[in-house]
Amino acid sequence: MAEYGQTARHVAPAELVATGKFTVPYAVNLTLSNTGGLFSNDLYKVKDTNGDVVFKVKAAFFSSRHLLLDAKGTPLLTMKPKVRRRRGTRRVFRGESTSPNDLLFSVRKSKMFQRKDNFDVVLATSTDEAAPCDFKIIVGSKEYTIYIGETDHEIIAQMNRKTECCARDRLEITVNQNVDFAFIVSLIVILEEIKPSRRSAM
């Protein structure tokens, strides 16, 4: 498990997913597209500004799990609903594991009763579920904004939604420097998967 510093600027370390591989000293622009088909477990593809594939997201057959893979198909993260907890909660594990020892972070709705669907991200190092969140996601009509901590003072990533032909959405993601962009992509995928049932399921 990665070690996390005490200051807000060190809460999103290079080692959250893979040692420094997905963290760079400059802002990163990515595009996430839905690639899901009726008989396919392919859900999303993430490309960089050169059009090269950076990540893929697949659904595990006969399971509620989703896998974030690198361009070579290596599993990086497993995203899974949290059983017997309030609806909308997701837990994210290292690789293909779902062991508590490999838990990296959880995503949950900020409050049970709120006008906007905002979400909290809590790192696995926070054992108290009532503790303040490590990151907050503010959801707009066509954008997500991700902040460090409880306040909205320090943005680490943003997503803007563009609608293309055949009603498919293209999500344009900007990740600030020194922020793990595999981590950011996993958060956006989780919100996209929660979205269809957000009003009725939470």
Give residue ranges: language-model regions:
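Solvent-exposed, positively charged interaction surfaces of folded domains
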Residues: 78
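Low-complexity or membrane-interfacial segments used for flexible interactions
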Residues: 2-65, 71-74, 87, 98-202
